[in-house]
C-alpha cells in the first residue's frame, strides 16, 4: 500500500501539472519513487486550424481527415468550412521497475489522446474532446527479449508518414498503404543480432484478439457486441522482421510483416441441422513491407501491403462490412523530405489504396458493387522546428472513387506541436 498510494498521487499531480500547469515540464519528465520505481511522463500538445474545400468521409474533417466523402454526401455549392482541432494532443505514463526475476524487469505503459467518442456536436460539444486509451500494456524484459501483454500496435503498423496535422490518424491512414491498428494481445520482441552489431535484426510475434463488425443482430446487441473476428474463436497472428543499420553518412531501416486471421461470417451460433452444414469461418491474410532511408539531410520512406479481408487493420479503404469484408487489394505510399537547415524542412507525400473491384464482384455476387473502389492521397508540408516546438503549413488532398462516381476534398492546415 505504501508504494501504490504515492504512485497514484504522483500520477494525478503530474497529469494536472503537464496538462494544466503554468510552467512547461522538461522533455520526458522522470519521477522517482522510493522503492526504485520511476515514472516517465511524455506526450505532446498539438493544435490545428484548417480550411476544408469539400467533405471528408467516415473519420472526420480535421486532424482525422483521410479520404473524400461519397458524391452524394458532398455539397455541390458553398463547399468551404473553417474549423480547429486539438484531439491529437497526447499524454503517456510509463512506469519502470528494478529487476524482479534475475535480469528481468517489468514496465507498464498507459497512453491516451482525445479522439474518444465522436459525438461532440456544435455548438460547445466539439470544443470538449473526450479521452480515449491508446495503449495499456505491461512488459517483462531482460533487454534483448521483451514479453508484452495488453493493448498495443499490431506489427502491421510500421513506417509512419511525417505530418504536423495527421498524427493520431496518420497521413493516408485507412486510405493508402498506411495500415495496422491497436489490439489487446500477447507480443514478443526478440533481438536476433549480437549487441553492438552494425546490422540490427529483430523478430516480432503477436497473437491478438480477433476483430471485425458484428455479423448478426444478436451479436450487435449492446450487452454482446461480438464482431465476426471475435466470433471465429481464433486470434489474429502476425510475424515481423525488422532490419536497421546506421553509419555517419547513411541510416536505413526495413521490415516485412505477415498476417493471418479468421472471421465467422454468420457470427455466434451455427446451423448444425442442415445437411452439409459447414464452419463459416473466412480466412484473411496479408503481407506488408516498408523501408526508411536517410542519406544526410534527405529522407525517403514508405510501405506497401497486399491482402484479403483486412478492413479491421484499416486496409481496403477501411471497408469491413460489405460482402463480410471479403475484399482483396493493395495499397502503397511514399514520402520524401529534405532538411534545408536545422530548422526548416519540406515534405511531399503520395499514396493510394486499390481494392480489387472485379474480384470482389466475382467472390460476392450478391453484395452489390463495392462502395469505395480507389483512393489517392497527396500531401505537402513546410515545417519549422526548434527544440520541442514545431509549426507547419500543410496541404492535403484526397481523390476517392465510389461506385456512385468520383469525389475529392482538400484541406489547408496550420498546425503547431509542443513535445512534452
Regions found by a protein language model. Name each.
Residues 1-12:
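Bacterial N-terminal signal peptides that target proteins for export
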Residues 16-25:
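C-terminal segment of classical bacterial N-terminal signal peptides
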Residues 384-386, 408-420:
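Outer-membrane beta-barrel "beta-signal"
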Residues 239, 244-372, 384:
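Detector for outer-membrane/organellar transmembrane beta-barrel domains
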Residues 55-60, 119-129, 160-167, 213-229, ...:
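Outer-membrane beta-barrel translocator domains and adjoining extracellular loop/strand segments
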Residues 86, 131, 181, 234-236, ...:
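Membrane-spanning beta-strands of outer-membrane beta-barrel proteins
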Residues 29-63, 67, 72-213, 231-238, ...:
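Outer membrane beta-barrel
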Residues 105-116, 205-209, 256-262, 345-354, ...:
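Transmembrane beta-strand segments that form the barrel wall of outer-membrane beta-barrel proteins
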Amino acid at each position: 500500500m505504501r508504494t501504490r498510494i504515492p504512485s497514484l498521487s504522483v500520477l494525478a499531480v503530474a497529469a494536472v501539472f503537464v496538462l494544466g500547469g503554468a510552467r512547461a515540464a522538461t522533455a520526458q519528465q522522470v519521477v522517482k519513487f522510493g522503492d526504485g520505481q520511476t515514472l516517465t511522463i511524455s506526450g505532446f500538445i498539438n493544435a490545428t486550424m484548417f480550411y476544408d474545400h469539400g467533405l471528408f468521409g467516415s473519420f472526420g474533417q480535421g486532424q482525422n481527415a483521410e479520404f473524400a466523402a461519397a458524391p452524394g454526401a458532398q455539397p455541390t455549392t458553398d463547399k468551404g468550412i473553417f474549423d480547429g482541432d486539438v484531439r491529437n494532443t497526447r499524454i503517456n505514463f510509463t512506469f519502470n521497475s528494478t529487476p524482479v526475476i534475475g535480469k528481468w524487469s517489468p514496465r507498464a505503459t498507459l497512453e491516451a489522446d482525445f479522439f474518444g467518442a465522436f459525438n461532440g456536436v456544435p455548438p460547445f460539444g466539439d470544443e470538449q474532446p473526450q479521452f480515449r486509451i491508446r495503449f495499456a500494456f505491461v512488459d517483462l524484459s531482460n533487454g534483448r527479449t521483451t514479453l508484452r501483454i495488453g493493448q498495443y500496435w499490431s506489427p502491421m503498423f510500421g513506417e509512419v508518414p511525417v505530418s504536423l496535422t495527421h498524427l493520431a490518424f496518420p497521413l493516408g491512414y485507412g486510405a493508402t498503404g498506411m495500415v495496422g491498428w491497436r489490439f489487446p494481445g500477447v507480443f514478443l520482441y526478440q533481438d536476433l543480432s549480437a549487441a553492438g552489431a552494425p546490422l540490427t535484426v529483430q523478430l516480432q510475434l503477436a497473437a491478438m484478439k480477433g476483430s471485425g463488425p458484428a455479423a448478426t443482430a444478436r451479436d450487435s446487441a449492446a450487452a454482446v457486441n461480438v464482431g465476426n473476428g471475435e466470433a471465429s474463436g481464433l486470434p489474429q497472428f502476425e510475424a515481423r522482421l525488422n532490419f536497421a543499420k546506421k553509419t555517419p553518412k547513411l541510416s536505413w531501416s526495413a521490415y516485412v510483416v505477415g498476417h493471418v486471421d479468421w472471421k465467422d461470417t454468420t457470427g455466434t451460433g451455427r446451423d448444425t441441422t442442415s445437411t452439409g452444414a459447414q464452419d463459416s469461418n473466412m480466412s484473411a491474410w496479408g503481407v506488408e513491407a516498408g523501408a526508411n532511408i536517410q542519406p544526410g539531410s534527405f529522407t525517403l520512406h514508405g510501405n506497401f501491403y497486399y491482402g484479403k479481408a483486412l478492413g479491421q487493420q484499416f486496409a481496403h479503404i477501411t471497408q469491413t462490412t460489405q460482402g463480410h469484408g471479403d475484399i482483396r487489394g493493395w495499397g502503397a505510399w511514399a514520402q520524401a523530405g529534405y532538411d534545408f537547415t536545422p530548422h526548416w524542412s519540406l515534405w511531399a507525400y503520395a499514396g493510394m489504396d486499390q481494392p480489387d473491384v472485379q474480384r470482389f464482384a466475382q467472390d460476392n455476387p450478391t453484395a452489390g458493387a463495392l462502395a469505395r473502389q480507389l483512393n489517392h492521397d497527396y500531401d505537402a508540408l513546410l515545417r519549422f522546428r526548434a527544440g520541442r516546438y514545431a509549426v507547419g503549413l500543410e496541404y492535403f488532398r484526397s481523390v476517392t472513387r465510389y461506385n456512385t462516381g468520383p469525389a475529392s476534398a482538400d484541406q489547408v492546415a496550420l498546425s503547431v506541436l509542443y513535445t512534452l
